[in-house]
Amino acid sequence: MAISIYNDFSDYMLFKGIKNVQTTDFKYKNIDVDITEDLVIKQFDAIYDFHQKSWGFNGYLRNRLNNNTGKIIEEYKIYIKKLVSDINNIKRDEPKNPFEELIIEYGEGAVKRGQACISAVYQTDYIGIISRSMKRNEVCLGNTDFQNLQKENYTYVVSFEHCSYNVVEMDCFILLSKLRRKGAKLDFQRLAREFCYIEGLDTSSSEFITALVSYPHEFMKCCNKYREGKNKDYEDRFYKKLSKALIQDGDSLF
């Protein structure tokens, strides 16, 4: 049996009927517009169509896809360990600025919440989710927001550059997490269930998505940037960002 050869995965998706368009063709260009749950569910239909057309790819790519399965979970675990170390160091040496005072005030809560999210992930059928993904050769679009993906008569995609092998649940997580951090007032647990209904996934998958969406992403990201920053003269800027992160992350979803 002959093996099909493509330069990029986008070439394969075009062959499968996905349309490559410019972002100016899209109705919802701004993620800050009022996003309703019905609109998100419609986006899930577009994501599902992409998934259906990408499942089971066994051709040859000159520019191969990355395999990001499990990557975000491992990154989130590392962020927790680094924040624990930061808290211990700041306590030992005393806070040097308002940013570090915020770390002392809210850091342990962020650690506990992050640990609870990771624990919730492992309480789902996480291994089963990965096994299913590998058997089906699942591919995620990676950028599932309204500026990159839309479905009308056809499914339209602006960029395929973030495509990777990964569990399909991640495409839902990426969308919901971004909407939550933008301040969208949505029932994220219900939306996780709706996505899984459309994709034919079980409750373990919806619980997996909810756990990841609940993770204090912005708090951890801000701490990482402060830790890695070469110029420590921007404490005031980091303080404002961390204060904003507390709002963006919202309350725990479980």
Where would I find each of the regions flagged by the language model?
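ATP/Mg2+ or Mg2+-diphosphate-binding catalytic cores
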Residues: 219-254
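ATP-binding pocket architecture of kinase catalytic cores
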Residues: 1-73, 77
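All-alpha amphipathic helical-bundle segments outside canonical DNA-binding/catalytic cores
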Residues: 203-211
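Active-site acidic catalytic loop and adjacent metal/ATP-binding pocket
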Residues: 123-172
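Active-site activation/catalytic loop segments of kinase-like enzymes and analogous catalytic loops
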Residues: 169-202, 214-231
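ATP-dependent phospho-/nucleotidyl transfer catalytic cores
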Residues: 28-34, 64-139, 190
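A glycine-centered beta->alpha junction motif in the catalytic cores
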Residues: 18-33, 52-56, 73, 78-96, ...
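Short, hydrophobic/amphipathic alpha-helical patches that form generic packing surfaces
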Residues: 49, 112, 210-218
